[in-house]
């Protein structure tokens, strides 16, 4: 299996030609091009180098946790959603996937201890978030999982921009954002 990027118009066209649930993009294209839709042996995907998305390994050192007064803990759980995303940070990202990952990384940095709540966000037959690349690939071979910064959380990125926006908005609401502000932030990140 090889991965290619297509623009939004082509994606919508191909998706619009779906005839049955679970039909892959390869099946649709084979049918549209008049090629045999017979079973094709799948080869494990080769990792694609994405220099803008690569992160240096982080060295972790263990430290004794310091007791924190309850008042400070309560203050840290509040997320300032009005200041969550930087327009300059968004503009520096490459494409919708980059902005999607940037927004999720900002959300993780704002509430790292609560971020695991996004694991509850799932589609009818889809898994959007996981704690490993393998879990997303097991759920869908075409998930194109990407790590959210160096958080240890992974997200599927093979959705169209509108679906990415919806997933981001659901993640924001899951972590306490007002739905109206979540929609506004989703549109800012993935207009």
Curated annotation (Swiss-Prot):
GO terms for cellular component: cytoplasm. Residues 96-97 are annotated as: Interaction with DNA. The keyword Cytoplasm applies. Homodimer. Polymerizes to form helical filaments. It is found in: Cytoplasm. This is Negative modulator of initiation of replication. It comes from the Bacteria. Pfam families: SeqA, SeqA_N. Belongs to the SeqA family. SUPFAM superfamilies: Replication modulator SeqA, C-terminal DNA-binding domain, Ribbon-helix-helix. Negative regulator of replication initiation, which contributes to regulation of DNA replication and ensures that replication initiation occurs exactly once per chromosome per cell cycle. Binds to pairs of hemimethylated GATC sequences in the oriC region, thus preventing assembly of replication proteins and re-initiation at newly replicated origins. Repression is relieved when the region becomes fully methylated. Gene3D superfamilies: Met repressor-like, Replication modulator SeqA, C-terminal DNA-binding domain. GO terms for biological process: negative regulation of DNA-templated DNA replication initiation; regulation of DNA-templated transcription. Its main location: cytoplasm. GO terms for molecular function: DNA binding. Keywords: Cytoplasm, DNA replication inhibitor, DNA-binding.
